[in-house]
Amino acid sequence: MKIAVLSGKGGTGKTLVSVNLAAVALDSVYIDCDVEEPNGHLFFQPKDLQKERVTVKLPQADPELCTGCRTCVNFCKFNALAYIKNKLIVFNEVCHSCGGCLLFCPQKAISEKEREIGLIQSGISGNVRVVSGMMNIGEVSGVPIIKKLLQDSRKENKNVFLDCPPGSACMVMESIKDADYCILVAEPTVFGVHNLEMVYELVRIFQKPFGVVLNKCLEEENPAEDFCLQNQITILEKIPFDLELGTMHSNGQIAVRKHPKYKELFLNLLKTVSKEARHETASDT
């Protein structure tokens, strides 16, 4: 089962939830899809690290064969190509590596070269296999890295926890495509409702079963909880505003490995999520 954990912004508690769920599961895989700022490995401190380069294909033209017909330039809808002063110019950052220019070039003047955009790091931490995507500084998009992460995860026959990027943009969409269930993490504020609504709309578009974890809850009014009740959204768990839990997390510690009360909290959450996911799967068959 693949469980994606997402939130409308950073700092909501997405990594807190995904790291502790992966740690409390008997045998699991934690995948950090937040390739711009991966931090899950800082908690797990995995051993026996392995690294794999992630590359994309970029076009290059043979000046001896290129006639300047501009077929490739006209084809590219991303404006990644320009023909200037008798030379084909490739804008690497805009290219989506679709390969269309290579296919449509009538002179067969275009070939492809590899360009590294990041890496995938994997290792072991106790009962958890920890996999992190890491995008090189200055890159425009981490989607190819996430695609590679998810491609590799299809081989896993374990519970897989996907720590998604914050927000609801392209990288988040790519992260949840293969998810069996989505956990939306929200804060108990009016601003938290706005962020929750963004990812709520996203999972509905992707027709993914989902539930909400309310983090940093106080005894006061909870606008995020009100939003869930109004929209008949399943509340999976309410995590209280807890100085001890926050301090552990800020110090890079995994709460379920440090204190039995947090182990019980996240174990109950895992049981609830598993039950909800099985129920949704049964409803679809």
Where are the regions that the model predicts?
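Short beta-strand-centered segment that lines the nucleotide-binding/catalytic pocket of NTP-utilizing
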Residues: S28-H41, E114-L119
